[in-house]
Amino acid sequence: TRRQTPQTDPRRLTKPVEEPLNLPSAAGKIQELQLIRVQTDAEVRIWNELMIQEHPRGAGPLVGAQIRYLIRSEHGWLGGLGFSASALQLKDRDRWIGWDAQTRRQQLHRVINLSRFLIRPSVHCHNLASRVLGMSLRCVADDFELRYGYRPWLVESFVDQSRHTGTCYQAANWRRVGQSAGRGRNDRHHRLSVPAKDIYLYPLARNVQRRLCD
């Protein structure tokens, strides 16, 4: 029988992450807005604590190849992002790309999922979400190549309309291509039921559909 690997609890801080102070009303007024790629133990703990305390889906675990970022400013920690493996099958995404089943299996690693995106609930700063999205999309392909030896060409993300309208994705020039089928990532037998979500895509390379179908 296959041995089950025990899951360990995520590393956390001993107290909540401090709230940012004196944050301006618009992202353009933040002088030192940075994305920090999570690497050190301290950064892992901050990211986990933020997600566990403030993101509706918690810290994970994320699936497959992954890169995580913290959003830092001179005012404090503003949130975080996590990129991980894409959905195995996604009808509207696969149709937009033009995939058949064999090509999808061969090229699926070139698509990554923005599986966590948190602007802290206490942060109210105009255009911050779309600005941070843009910053992450400019560095994530390089960071994936540095860590895993290949470049992703497309990012997908899911938006639950009961919680969000997708405005920040639209402002950052993502493309809405349809809806998910309301099943989990590994639900091959149609047994799970989760809310259907809007699917947004963002190309990280030119001619992305042709590349993914080659």
Q: Whereabouts are the PLM-identified features?
A:
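Short, charged, solvent-exposed linker or helix-capping segments at domain edges/interfaces
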Residues: 210-214
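Hydrophobic or amphipathic alpha-helical targeting/insertion segments
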Residues: 1-9, 163-165
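Conserved N-terminal entry element of GNAT/NAT acetyltransferase domains
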Residues: 6-40
